Amino acid sequence: YKQAAEIAKQMNWNKVKDWSTLATIINVQEAAGDYEEARDMAILAYNRNLGGRKLIYKLTEFFIKVDDFENAEELYREYAKLSAHDVNKYILYYDLRRAQDAPDTELVDILEKYKEAEIDEKYMYELAELYYKTGRKEDCSKTCDNLVLWFQDGIYVEKAVKLKEKLGVTMTNTQKKILSEINARKSDEEANKERLFMEQKELARLKKDEVGDLLDEDD
């Protein structure tokens, strides 16, 4: 991606009017982590009325990533106006306000509105974390319970179980089993790291002995 992004940088895209081509370049620049270049390409497409609501959403994301909050807010309002029934507007606004260091209580309000319309394990977990930070222990526990019940496994289920353990509240048998599996896996990983370290240490010792033997032969 980085090589393709560098090549794209050197080309003149001002006369390109094909949306699919510009969209590809925007995606390449984003994948390469060059958000300023991706933003500039997205602005080019936006000024030509290409891409529709998806481009407005993406361009707002780029403005957020480069800390241009004034333009991000303006575009967010445009997106929200065009997407009155699109629940993703809550996530876009959440990303914007979080980047602006909004109070946790405000972020909770945004994610609660999103949760009313959409069930997503990532944002359910983030909501649970915000409940924890704002002292809403019961809401945090309940959200963790629902996340485990509805999704059953995966990274956010495991995070929810660990967060509930952090709360110090009673866990269900299913949650205890998940936590036990997490701890067992962690122990295995630590054991493997220790084994690898000892193998490397022994290898280094053997090489040192070999060098010593060669020096003795030279003498």
Regions found by a protein language model. Name each.
Residues 176-219:
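Intrinsically disordered, low-complexity acidic segments enriched in Asp/Glu and Pro
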Residues 21-22, 56, 89-90, 124, ...:
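Canonical tetratricopeptide repeat
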Residues 1, 35, 69, 103-104, ...:
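TPR-repeat structural position
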Residues 9-17, 43-51, 77-85, 112-119, ...:
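Solenoid-like repeat scaffolds
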Residues 23-30, 43, 54-119:
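Alpha-helical adaptor scaffolds
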Residues 4, 38, 72, 106-107, ...:
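Single-residue signature of alpha-solenoid repeat helices
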Residues 81-83, 135-156, 161-186:
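TPR/TPR-like (Sel1-like) alpha-helical repeat modules
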